[in-house]
Amino acid sequence: MKIINILFCLLLIVLNSCNANDNDTFNNNSVQQTKSRKKRDLSQKELLQQEKITLTSDEEKMFTSLVTAFKYTVEKLSGDTNGCNNENKNKCTGFFDWLSEDIQKQKELAGAFTKVYNFLKSKAQNEAFDTYIKGAIDCKKTLHKIVIIITNMEKVRTKRAYFRGVAGSIFTDNNDNDGIYKCLKDELLNDTSNHYEGLTSDWDN
């Protein structure tokens, strides 16, 4: 009888031990599932946030015009003695390819470009904006007002458009996309710069 009692006690100990292991396994699985669920929820939240960022029609229009203006400028100035060479052309292409994946940065640049865009659009009158700007870059229009550039602290009037001066600054002095982005945004927002003053001064209307 004593032997039976001993065996029964041993059986209870074994069962309790197994149950404890099962509980540990269950708890570990629960923790892992909770972590996985949180990670999945976070990823979905980030994805939803990215999906919410879109350009308005006006932002898209301004950003497209900005890209067109600078690509056209650098294309025209390839090989020029002012530093807008093939290296800058490659930087420009690479930069806007990089920017095409980041809607938030596109929104920020469109916003920064608003003041310049609206000013030039008011001068374009009935002419399409991109056509008007390309004409200025080609120096075929009467946009010689967009030509004041500061050299050795003196104002010099040349047949250089606003976009040429800015393009020279951002692509010549920066070697990475983040640097180009920051410089471009700062230039567009700076309404006290030589480029902006040259753009907006001495208009007849």
UniProtKB/Swiss-Prot annotation:
Function: An outer membrane protein that may participate in pathogenesis. Some human Lyme disease patients have antibodies against this protein. The Mlp proteins probably undergo intragenic recombination, generating new alleles.
Family from the record: Belongs to the Multicopy lipoprotein (Mlp) family.
Localization annotation: Cell outer membrane
Protein keywords: Cell outer membrane, Lipoprotein, Membrane, Palmitate, Plasmid, Signal
Membrane topology, from the record: Lipid-anchor
Protein source organism: Borreliella burgdorferi (strain ATCC 35210 / DSM 4680 / CIP 102532 / B31) (Borrelia burgdorferi)
Gene (name only): mlpB
Span of the signal peptide: 1-17
UniProt miscellaneous comment: This plasmid is not found in the completely sequenced reference strain B31.
Name of this protein: Lipoprotein MlpB
N-palmitoyl cysteine: lipidated positions: C18
A cellular component annotation (GO) from this entry: cell outer membrane
Lipid moiety-binding region (S-diacylglycerol cysteine): C18
